[in-house]
Amino acid sequence: MSEANSTPTATLPSMRVSYEAGSLDEGSLAGTWHEQLALWFEQAVHDPSIHEANAMVLATADADGLPSSRTVLCKGFDARGVVFFTNYTSAKSHDLKVTRFAAATFPWLAMQRQVNVRGTVEKVSQEETAEYWAERPRGSQLGAWASPQSRVVSGRSALESTLNGIERRFADAEKVPVPPHWGGWRIVPESVEFWQGRPDRLHDRLRFRNNDGAWVVERLAP
């Protein structure tokens, strides 16, 4: 058998896991979506099998409806929504400016859980951006100045050359200022779904949905 014919993808149809790690019912659900997210997030943080519990897959679409997804880091959430930070000239930011919608998924696979957030987006305040910026390592701050995110570059050496220039520019600065092209986005949820894997694919799916300002909880078929 040739190497091409022995590809591991031949086993894909038979690859499956039985989900038996837990259950989720209406009676055990917290009173609000953000309280439930905080509960699950805390458990994910303390699960040694989960690395970067705040990683979430962010989905956007451009003006033509062409979708894109990428992993970003959640840097905060509360009753107002879920926050991440990025370059405001990036492809994702361009999508968000055009459509004003986004979806994000926390894939806590080791716990057989997902949380799916869908809604509109808004920029966070300059004060919120400055507060988070101050927490970033200096190297990350300099990198944010140096990277023309999502644009084609001639090679890594070009990025490193730009970074070297930025390092010289701020060499004598005690604090690196926030770039004018950088800041936070908040996903303001219209719905937040909590998914718990169950045996025989009869998964638990409980969704908080904003119904004209009043949140309702609904069970969805798996």
From Swiss-Prot:
Database matches in InterPro entries: Pyridox_Oxase (IPR000659), Pyridox_Oxase_CS (IPR019740), Pyridox_Oxase_N (IPR011576), Pyridoxamine_oxidase_dimer_C (IPR019576), Split_barrel_FMN-bd (IPR012349)
Chain positions recorded as FMN binding sites: 70-75, 85-86, 92, 114, 149-150, 195, 205
Residues the record lists as binding substrate: 16-19, 75, 132, 136, 140, 201-203
UniProt key word GTP-binding: no
SUPFAM superfamilies: FMN-binding split barrel
Manner of cofactor binding, per the entry note: Binds 1 FMN per subunit.
Keywords annotated in UniProt: Flavoprotein, FMN, Oxidoreductase, Pyridoxine biosynthesis
EC number: 1.4.3.5
Pathway where this protein functions: Cofactor metabolism; pyridoxal 5'-phosphate salvage; pyridoxal 5'-phosphate from pyridoxamine 5'-phosphate: step 1/1; Cofactor metabolism; pyridoxal 5'-phosphate salvage; pyridoxal 5'-phosphate from pyridoxine 5'-phosphate: step 1/1
Cofactor(s) needed by this chain: FMN
Similarity remark: Belongs to the pyridoxamine 5'-phosphate oxidase family.
Protein's name in the database: Pyridoxine/pyridoxamine 5'-phosphate oxidase
UniProt organism field: Saccharopolyspora erythraea (strain ATCC 11635 / DSM 40517 / JCM 4748 / NBRC 13426 / NCIMB 8594 / NRRL 2338)
This protein's encoding gene: pdxH
